[in-house]
């Protein structure tokens, strides 16, 4: 995997100055009665741990003219050059404002594919006794999905000392050869195009036949909503924390519970903006592939478009319908015919794929709202309850993240389980959704009501 897979390359090129597609893992450490770690102590800790994470020793090298997919190369920068110190002791910052600032600025993966932001001196953080240390691991989506982010968080901050390299299917890094890659891609373009046609056509025909015969269900585009406006580079983040016990006890999973609440909140928001009776709301839910599925890309997730059924007033019926829709879409995206059709692009010439993508990004509208969309929002769900993260004597109070916004998506949701907490991070573009705080309050109420209906649990000791 010295040359990037097309799917990872798409994540790399989708990130732009006005749109970060990076992965963000935010960890809030509580030192209790002890002094919080200094920035130099955090650097020393990460330097010691990062040597056993080969994934953190690579970056990306692009070929001139994009005649070939980028290459994984070794990163010559020392670990300390990847850490950024942020003094948050001025009283103006919160965890939410800190995450909003970071999520609006993508990293340049051709220079450094990851950074660790260390926020020090943040006071009045719920659940933290003293000054909080907020560590945000920002990593290019081209080299990390949610599962990889969990492995990296455990390797860097997990309790106990690692003695072996973190077991990940790491890309093979080589020396940079941009001119060679470009020349080879240009010379081989006609041959690669010719060789790609038969397998691509065959795979696409099988997939489309399955869709036509009703064996696989592909949701048709539906009318867009207010929160489908194209976002600009500004970001706002709301962090909602709940006891894990509030989300358990009933038959619904945390993911289905979150989708049920999000559907109710989105429907309420639509009604407040003159769009009542929306029964077509959908969420994009990243679906992980099992380890047994042959997959050349670093990112082992595919998007599933899940109907939220807001027309069903009863939360139990709505959750059941959502669970069925989620299972149906997971079956769709993991079906061998869909996987074969997706993988068939691997043999297509890089220059043509990247050229089409570059043209699409250049001509795509940066403002306004599309007429129709496949999904209205994003809901990611990551289980990190198995982690026990520490930084010196400080213990992690929470571990969460931010889901990226993109074209036609101005509101996203990231659901994280860690310890005895479930954290829901709402990211929004304040330019296109100026009343994002109202939506966050709607979602909080919807979560309380949904958990009560599905799990028989009352609201208890919500920290934020």
Predicted regions and their residues:
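Soluble acyl-CoA-dependent acyltransferase catalytic core bearing the H(X)4D motif
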Residues: 1-6, 26-37, 47-51, 58-407, ...
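Hydrophobic/aromatic beta-strand elements that line small-molecule binding cavities or substrate pockets
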Residues: 413
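A cross-kingdom marker of C-terminal helix-rich interaction/assembly modules
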Residues: 437-441
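General N-terminal leader/first-domain-start detector
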Residues: 1-18, 22-24
């Amino acid at each position: 995997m010295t040359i990037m897979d097309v799917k990872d390359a798409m994540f790399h090129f989708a990130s732009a100055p006005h749109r970060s597609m990076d992965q963000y893992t935010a960890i809030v450490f509580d030192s209790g009665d002890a002094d919080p770690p200094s920035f130099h102590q955090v650097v020393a800790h990460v330097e010691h741990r990062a040597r056993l994470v080969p994934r953190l020793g690579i970056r990306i090298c692009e070929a001139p003219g994009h005649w070939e997919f980028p290459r994984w190369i070794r990163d010559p920068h020392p670990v300390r050059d990847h850490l950024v110190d942020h003094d948050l002791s001025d009283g103006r910052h919160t965890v939410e404002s800190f995450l909003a600032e970071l999520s609006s600025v993508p990293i340049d993966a051709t220079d450094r594919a990851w950074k660790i932001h260390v926020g020090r001196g943040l006071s009045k953080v719920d659940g933290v006794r003293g000054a909080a240390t907020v560590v945000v691991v920002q990593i290019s989506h081209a080299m990390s999905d949610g599962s990889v982010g969990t492995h990296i968080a455990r390797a860097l901050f997990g309790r106990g000392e690692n003695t072996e390299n973190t077991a990940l299917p790491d890309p093979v890094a080589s020396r940079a050869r941009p001119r060679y890659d470009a020349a080879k891609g240009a010379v081989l373009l006609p041959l690669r195009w010719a060789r790609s046609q038969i397998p691509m056509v065959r795979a696409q025909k099988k997939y489309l036949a399955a869709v036509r015969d009703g064996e696989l269900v592909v949701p048709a585009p539906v009318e867009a909503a207010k929160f489908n406006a194209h976002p600009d580079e500004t970001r706002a983040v709301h962090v909602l924390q709940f006891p894990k016990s509030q989300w358990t006890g009933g038959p619904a999973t945390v993911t289905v519970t979150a989708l049920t609440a999000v559907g109710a909140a989105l429907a309420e928001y639509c009604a407040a903006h003159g769009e009542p009776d929306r029964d077509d709301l959908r969420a994009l839910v990243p679906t992980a592939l099992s380890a047994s599925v042959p997959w050349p890309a670093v990112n082992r997730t595919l998007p599933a478009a899940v109907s939220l059924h807001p027309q069903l007033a009863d939360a139990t019926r709505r959750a059941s319908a959502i669970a069925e829709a989620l299972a149906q879409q997971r079956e769709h995206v993991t079906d061998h015919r869909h996987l074969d059709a997706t993988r068939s692009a691997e043999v297509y010439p890089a220059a043509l794929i990247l050229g089409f993508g570059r043209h699409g990004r250049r001509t795509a509208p940066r403002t306004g709202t599309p007429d129709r969309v496949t999904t209205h929002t994003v809901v990611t769900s990551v289980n990190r309850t198995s982690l026990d993260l520490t930084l010196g004597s400080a213990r992690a109070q929470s571990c969460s993240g931010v889901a990226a916004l993109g074209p036609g998506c101005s509101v996203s949701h990231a659901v994280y389980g860690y310890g005895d907490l479930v954290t829901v991070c709402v990211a929004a573009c304040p330019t296109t959704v100026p009343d994002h705080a109202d939506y966050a309050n709607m979602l909080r109420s919807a979560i309380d009501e949904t958990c009560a209906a599905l799990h028989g649990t009352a609201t208890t000791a919500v920290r934020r």
